[in-house]
């Protein structure tokens, strides 16, 4: 008589009785439900039950001899459903410039120049909305983005604008900054409403700006989470081992202190270096 919904692995298990009066806010039925769990469980046909903003239960349609009451029922016959799927890596900014440097080997450097010198808050807000719309188009309602190609660390407004632009479309968005990649120093321009002001960007500015963003934007909106998102953790080329260790430890400290995810790139040897030194 008991139905076990979703997976204990993700803490979303919900048991309920077939004979009880059930009421869900949303019930998706007859879809091909791909759970994205470690067992690669697929229910076809299957259902997904939602209460408020939480997946309450999933399973095969055979577990529902009579449809429970629901505020809304959607028949997804012929469609795939991936409950809980997260687009776990993106770069805020790329949606608006992704075709500009398509055939250039130096596209990453050019993207950094655009992000640091040719953008304002409206750029980041508009890009956040466009990226969110594209994610929704492909059935994804939670996204994670690093703000910039390598994070822009001289100001925090791009983070807030990207979160706002994404959340107003209706998705749950996690965006952030952290230690940026070289070369150093970088040149940045910021729009103050009347003109651009120029500044020189140094690596340790990321410590201050990352923490300021965490303080400013977490708790502002239920669909927005500001995270720690350094461009790379491990052993960055062009920096000493001591500097890398300091960067890595500070990013870890901020994520732990503010209780947010730590999201980054890591390449050959980075994981071992982090394990040995952080």
Describe these PLM feature segments.
Residues 36-38, 151-154, 236-240:
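A generic structural signal for short coil/turn motifs at secondary-structure boundaries
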């Amino acid at each position: 008589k008991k139905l076990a919904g979703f997976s204990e692995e993700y803490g979303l298990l919900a048991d309920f009785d077939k004979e009880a009066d059930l009421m869900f806010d949303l019930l998706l039925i007859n879809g091909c439900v791909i759970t994205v769990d470690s067992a690669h469980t697929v229910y076809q046909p299957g259902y997904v039950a939602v209460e408020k903003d939480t997946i309450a239960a999933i399973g095969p349609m055979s577990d529902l001899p009579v449809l429970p009451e629901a505020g809304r029922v959607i028949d997804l016959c012929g469609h795939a459903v991936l409950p809980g799927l997260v687009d776990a890596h993106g770069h805020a900014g790329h949606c608006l410039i992704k075709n500009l440097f398509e055939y250039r080997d130096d596209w990453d450097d050019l993207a950094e120049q655009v992000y640091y010198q040719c953008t304002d808050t409206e750029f980041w807000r508009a890009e956040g909305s466009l990226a969110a719309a594209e994610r929704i188009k492909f059935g994804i309602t939670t996204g994670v983005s690093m703000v910039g190609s390598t994070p822009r660390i001289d100001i925090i407004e791009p983070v807030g604008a990207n979160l706002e632009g994404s959340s107003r479309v209706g998705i749950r968005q996690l965006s952030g900054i952290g230690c940026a990649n070289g070369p150093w120093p970088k040149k940045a321009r910021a729009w103050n409403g009347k003109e651009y002001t120029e500044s020189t960007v140094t690596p340790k500015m990321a410590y201050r700006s990352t923490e300021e963003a965490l303080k400013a934007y977490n708790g502002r909106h239920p669909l927005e989470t500001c995270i720690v998102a350094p461009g790379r953790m491990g052993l960055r080329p062009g920096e000493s081992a001591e500097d890398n260790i300091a960067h890595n430890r500070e990013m870890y400290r901020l994520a732990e202190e503010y209780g947010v995810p730590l999201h980054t790139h890591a390449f050959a040897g980075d994981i071992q270096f982090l394990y040995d030194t952080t």
